[in-house]
Design a protein with these regions (language model features):
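Short, structured segments at the rim of ligand-binding sites
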Residues: 1-184
């Protein structure tokens, strides 16, 4: 990471997010308190991701606008975080373990208050379960996953880039696939 600025505040930063987007989230969240317009130039091929979209969505919900032009993120000065009450979404990462159990056993699982409009990237794990033959429904109570009756699954290839936290959950299902499950970008 390289940060440049004039005396009195930072104005821009350059950042490679190919290995982790956590530094970008941190810079985005601190930008409104700098007192200057702030631009973050992304130097890597990867420019965005599910966790960055979560960060930007939360900033927006707290009254801070962050613009993304495809290469750089721009935060205008003069913005302040404003919110007195905020309802935190259920943890989709943890919910995926229960969804995987339904897939593995051929049973049914509903995790209350988890819905498809969640901003969390791990929700993409449900797309994997659908490819494996599970039935996924967003009910009033929460997302319901029903596994296949026989507990057998086809082999598939999955790009885990936007939900890499679920790599181990998928690995737990892998021994029960009829052929190989391949993952990529799981780091």
């Amino acid at each position: 990471m390289r940060v440049r600025g004039k005396r009195g505040g930072f104005k821009e930063a350059s950042l490679d997010i190919s290995r982790s987007t956590q530094f970008l989230s941190a810079l985005l969240m601190m930008a409104p308190v700098l007192g200057e317009d702030f631009t973050i130039h992304i130097t890597s091929e990867k420019k965005d991701g599910s966790y960055i979209r979560i960060t930007r969505k939360l900033m927006e919900q707290f009254g801070v606008e962050c613009n993304f032009d495809g290469d750089s993120y721009h935060i205008k000065k003069g913005q302040q975080y404003q919110r007195e009450v905020y309802e935190i979404e259920p943890d989709v990462s943890a919910a995926c373990y229960f969804y995987a159990m339904a897939a593995l056993t051929g049973g049914r699982t509903v995790v209350k208050s988890v819905h498809k409009d969640s901003m969390q990237g791990d929700l993409r794990f449900l797309e994997v379960l659908e490819k494996l033959g599970c039935h996924v429904t967003d009910t009033e109570a929460g997302i319901e996953v029903t596994g296949t009756n026989d507990g057998h699954y086809p082999g598939i290839t999955v790009d885990m880039n936007d939900f890499s936290d679920q790599t181990m959950t998928l690995a737990a299902l892998a021994p029960f696939a009829d052929c190989l499950l391949y993952t990529s970008d799981a780091a």
